[in-house]
Regions:
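Short beta-strand-to-loop capping motifs
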Residues: 7-9, 67-73, 116-122, 170-174
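Core RNA-modification/binding signature centered on pseudouridine synthases
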Residues: 135-216
Length: 216
């Protein structure tokens, strides 16, 4: 049986990388002695699958993990045992059993919602800059990586932006085709210099099909 675990990552643990979060979950499963299923081969691993990678330093308020178990176990037991051993900053919110043959998280999640809060107040030019960004056909950005430089179109990933008070709500495409990094978006807006005064949270992940938008 497989459970889809809905959880959050807050505070200093948001600075853990995708790989470090996976290791955290592996250790938690072992510590609470749940009957997790293991892969076959020379280097067996717990059968766990995370949703789309979250950028380091970005809190995740609605994250997902698929966990396969070798025998039946009650949802209440899984949630209770995990929350007993997980460190402060990571918490299971709820979980549900998946039907056999369900697609993996990375294959179905295709939209993310971010909340970008300006702790010193929304810049006076924010609305003007957002309007210009949305009106543009392209917004090319040179992304640096260990493999070299790659030019990407940030505008093509953005589905919508809404300003509420001192916060921006940014809806973006995500999934196997990639996504933008919020730090890149803030850089092209000219806000990199005040990044330390900006709080970034990934508040939702969605499965979007046409006009329908559902949680995983």
């Amino acid at each position: 049986m497989t459970y889809r675990i809905h959880y959050e990552v807050r505070g200093t643990l948001s600075f853990l990388s995708h790989l470090e979060i996976m290791r955290l979950w592996q250790r938690a499963m072992l510590r609470c002695h749940l009957p997790i299923a293991w892969s076959q081969g020379f280097n067996p691993r717990p059968k766990l699958s995370l949703g789309p990678a979250r950028n380091v330093g970005v809190e995740g308020l609605s994250e997902y993990l698929d966990a396969e178990f070798s025998e039946s176990v009650r949802a209440e037991e899984v949630m209770s045992k995990l929350n007993e051993v997980l460190p402060d900053g990571v918490k299971v919110l709820d979980l549900r059993e998946l039907a056999p043959g369900s697609k993996m998280l990375e294959a179905v999640i295709n939209e993310a919602m971010y909340k970008i809060t300006f702790l010193q107040g929304l810049p006076e030019d924010a609305k003007e800059k957002i309007a210009a960004f949305l009106a543009a056909e392209q917004c090319l950005y040179l992304r640096q990586s260990p493999k070299g430089e790659k030019e990407i179109d940030l505008r093509s990933y953005v589905l919508g932006i809404e300003i509420v008070g001192d916060s921006m709500f940014l809806a973006v495409k995500t999934g196997s085709t990639g996504s933008l990094r919020v730090a890149e978006f803030l850089t092209v807006l000219g806000y990199w210099d005040i990044i330390k005064d900006i709080k970034i949270q990934r508040i939702s992940l969605f499965v979007t099909e046409g006009a329908k938008r559902n949680t995983p």
